[in-house]
Amino acid sequence: MANLLLAGYFGCGNLGDDAILLGFLNGIAGKGHEIQTLCGSPDRVMNAYGVRGIPRLDFNEVGRALDDTDALVFPGGSIFQDITSMRSVAYYYKLVAMAKKRGKKVVMLGQGVGPLNGMIGRTLSAKAFNLADAVVVRDPGSSDTLRKIGYKGMPRLAADAAFLLPAPQVEEDLPRFGVAGMKTVGISVRPFGKDKGKAVIETFAELTRILFSNGWMPVLIEMDSAMDKSVISAIGKANGGKVPEIKNLQSPIDVQKRMTRMDAVIA
């Protein structure tokens, strides 16, 4: 049995990252390991996922958790990237350095690496991965990025941990959004690019119009209330407020259940 400390963007309101956490927990369940996770909200991860959380920005608590662990495990996500902020790379590199200073194992699983546009981001990411004891990426592009920034090892390739989520139980009382025989398409959007999502809004506003005119009902899915809300609202307004939205979901399981009522998903 090992004591594992997980690290990622967990318990911060992003249901995609939480899907990775929950998938990893489901995959490793029954193996006898003691697990804690660094997270944005310890109460949230305990109530939703049944795992003890450590405040991710309280480095005194983080240090004590590392002292008590056997390995620091990164279950996945695109956390080594500088497209949103270089602080993400700096934070996760610091965790790796703290773990190795204490003689702990560091395991990178299902990593989506990049974009890494700045020299500092590339340098810190290369250092972090070269310090790791095992590296697994979730796509060939991430493997190529690691090679380009100076990673000296040979990463393994594996699926995203979210694929370890169990199939949801279909609930008959969940609402359907299709009307008059229309099929339903779930749409997940994120603000992206230097224009703060303007191109995303324009593209998906047009997409929703095309779908509706061709007999499909588009439904906007809020995966991260802090990041997605404004983009979803703008897409809805561009269509006269007529695009259904799914908001305030509490866990990846809630997302899965809603998706059982859909015919397709575009992200």
Enumerate the predicted regions with their spans.
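Active-site anion-handling motifs in enzyme catalytic cores
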Residues: 1-267
